[in-house]
């Protein structure tokens, strides 16, 4: 039987405890899980793609079946093809997320027939955590500690001091 290979993607700008939970749960479902840090060169983020990739790599040290990859300006299905991915993994917090993800699923099926998508439901205590909300809290100089891994808070503080 061939390996089950998953791909969980995001901008992770910044990575949240919700992302972390989904990645950890997804890693148990696959022989190999790629975590794709996607960047858009036209957008300025809190942290660079390389910084976000480095944070994720630190968070998953010792989890042998997780590999973090960086992708700039390409489609998820192209990354999936490159790594032999059998399943995309997406997190759902609510019905709005399902509607949003369904539209991508439609096109992904057209571009990569046979590539399946698995949806993981966010834990109730994490369903309101989002990178957008964390960025807004940062804008208003509020504590983001409850919503992100400690290393994320540290990296953002370092960047603010520059």
UniProtKB/Swiss-Prot annotation:
Pathways per UniProt: Cofactor biosynthesis; coenzyme A biosynthesis; CoA from (R)-pantothenate: step 4/5
Record-listed E.C. numbers: 2.7.7.3
GO CC annotation: cytoplasm
Main location: cytoplasm
Residues annotated as transmembrane: none
Residues annotated for ATP binding in this entry: 11-12, 19, 91-93, 101, 126-132
Keywords (A to Z) from UniProt: ATP-binding, Coenzyme A biosynthesis, Cytoplasm, Magnesium, Nucleotide-binding, Nucleotidyltransferase, Transferase
Catalysed conversion reaction: (R)-4'-phosphopantetheine + ATP + H(+) = 3'-dephospho-CoA + diphosphate
Site (Transition state stabilizer): 19
Assembly notes: Homohexamer.
Family: Belongs to the bacterial CoaD family.
Function: Reversibly transfers an adenylyl group from ATP to 4'-phosphopantetheine, yielding dephospho-CoA (dPCoA) and pyrophosphate.
Protein name: Phosphopantetheine adenylyltransferase
Source species: Streptococcus suis (strain 05ZYH33)
């Amino acid at each position: 039987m061939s390996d089950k290979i998953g791909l969980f993607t995001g901008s992770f700008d910044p990575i949240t405890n919700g992302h972390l939970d989904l990645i950890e749960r997804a890693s148990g479902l696959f022989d190999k899980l790629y975590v794709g840090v996607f960047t858009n060169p036209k957008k300025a983020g809190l942290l660079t793609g390389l910084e976000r990739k480095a944070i994720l790599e630190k968070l998953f040290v010792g989890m042998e079946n997780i590999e973090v990859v960086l992708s700039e300006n390409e489609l998820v299905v192209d990354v999936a093809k490159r790594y032999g991915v059998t399943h995309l993994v997406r997190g759902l917090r609510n019905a709005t997320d399902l509607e949003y993800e369904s539209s991508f699923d439609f096109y992904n099926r057209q571009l990569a027939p046979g590539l399946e998508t698995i949806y993981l439901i966010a834990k109730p205590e994490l369903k309101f955590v989002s990178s957008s909300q964390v960025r807004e809290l940062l804008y208003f100089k509020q504590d983001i500690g409850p919503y992100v891994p400690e290393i994320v808070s540290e990296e953002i503080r370092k960047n603010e001091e520059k």
